[in-house]
């Protein structure tokens, strides 16, 4: 990795160092081990990895598959829990003394850095699973000494046990810290369930901490560089940006550019971004007592350190001798009490560039007295700010916002309260997943849907509606594709999208290329007419939502297709979805859910460079599918003729529209020879091996099921003569799973 800082702190050797948003250790990067290939991935790096679909296996969960967190949480005395957390915040421990006698700043940073990994493009990251406990996050430079914060919480976790998850505890600690300082938060929701191994996520392609070269395509001109998708941070191992400025160059205006981009990729607008920085830096401090090398991060630390890293050799190694980032900034005169002092100091002085005791670039108030108290009773200091703090004053957009808040702190308090709530809950999905007594009213960013305000349809109604759908003139492919388009927008990463809300009929989803708007214009009016006719004639206050009818229509089509293939099946259907309005739908926020590709529909946007088979597995990951479920769905959707635009790629059957295992049987037929098409990019032609006559066409999203050894093993099961019925059953089960992915109310 190349050097990321033109002005890094003095160092005992010449290895790269840099600093991160508020904290980040002045340490050497761990060196990747150079070795001969040891795994299949090492030998064949281009082979699609389906093992990602089987992460977070229940076998690794020590609580067992029957454990229900919501049930356990209901036993929690939340008020007693809150008191204990706040008492902990205000009780300094000798092994890691608290700044100013309070861990508020440390816990705010821990919660912020847990939630701040969230990124909008793929919904990965966030505080929702307790990922900060595991590598690489537990050893990121930006998370230095947060291992101590989590250890400080252990007595709380030990006491309350299964009634509070680590994920909830890590997130709530920051909320409690704010309240301990006198701030009125907007609310807090519990409901985050722990994972038991690292989240499967590409954080970047750089192979050393603090690198930027790969995510910016080799250019690091801070004025012109473009951060690649889906990354949410400017630098490997940082949450957002380098607080010394881009590439360590202390330029507040250039830093503002990076701040705007990275916070925007976390779904924050300019006002929310400014509020988070101002509010987050109102309490606590950074740590750069000296220019020394701290020890290795937790994952690289000696076994006797028991998962604690960054051991500091300076002085006592803690308290006033702590080295975390090399930056030594205390933002206010009251670092344990909520106030408007951050803005009062930011605008009350002119600022001049200086170096911290750790050698990092920061700003010091010009011609100022030493009014900042020392955290451990030492001499007072002059006011200091990070480069990124000064950005809040000099940037032409952030500046007017923060200057307004200087005179109207009540506006800042409200903006921060709502932005913090959004930060802590952005990856939790709809309010129906929230637990506890402090849940705030639904917000637009939560993609709200109306509550059910009518009687739900019963079995006889369901049968009548299925009959009406099948007699409407709409085809099996039309009904299947519409239901799939509605439900498959779901992302299991941040629990967004899905069929509930019927947003398929609203912008932006109605216009997405993958959803074939011209086809929706044919299908949706017919379904809306069936809905209106039913609701007008139903008795007992019963109604059917369009969201429910779209799913029910698709299920009716699957049942018909199975029956046409000789199998009588019933596709499970659970009513209870409601229809959102356009006013309840943030068009810009939903835009990031638009699929680049959907291998289940054999769709890819023109010019897509990522291999289609890789994008297919990624889509399956979002839909929380296993490899067998993905395989069953592909085989079924191909025979149901549900491809985008009516494409025949992968439709390996002479009876399209009939649910059968023909896709698998014909894929494995050794009488077919496959070659790349000479006419169409990313298409393969299958010809009769003996005669050379054309038989089929396919994409990589089809042929991967014959080329990948793991997927081929599953295909062979479904192609067997004695497993035709099993395939139908497995397809239906996987179909229902996708249709219900966002039905958190079903439990």
UniProtKB/Swiss-Prot annotation:
Homodimer or homotetramer. Its EC number is 1.11.1.21. Residues 1-22 have a biased composition (Basic and acidic residues). GO terms for cellular component: cytosol. Keywords: Heme, Hydrogen peroxide, Iron, Metal-binding, Oxidoreductase, Peroxidase. This is Catalase-peroxidase 1. The record marks 109 as: Transition state stabilizer. It holds the Pfam family peroxidase. It catalyses: H2O2 + AH2 = A + 2 H2O; 2 H2O2 = O2 + 2 H2O. Bifunctional enzyme with both catalase and broad-spectrum peroxidase activity. It is an enzyme of class 1 (oxidoreductase). One of its GO terms (molecular function) is heme binding. CDD domains: catalase_peroxidase_2 (cd08200). Heme b binds at residue 281. It comes from the Bacteria. The active site is at residue 113. The keyword Iron applies. Formation of the three residue Trp-Tyr-Met cross-link is important for the catalase, but not the peroxidase activity of the enzyme. There is a cross-link at residues 240-266 (Tryptophyl-tyrosyl-methioninium (Tyr-Met) (with W-112)).
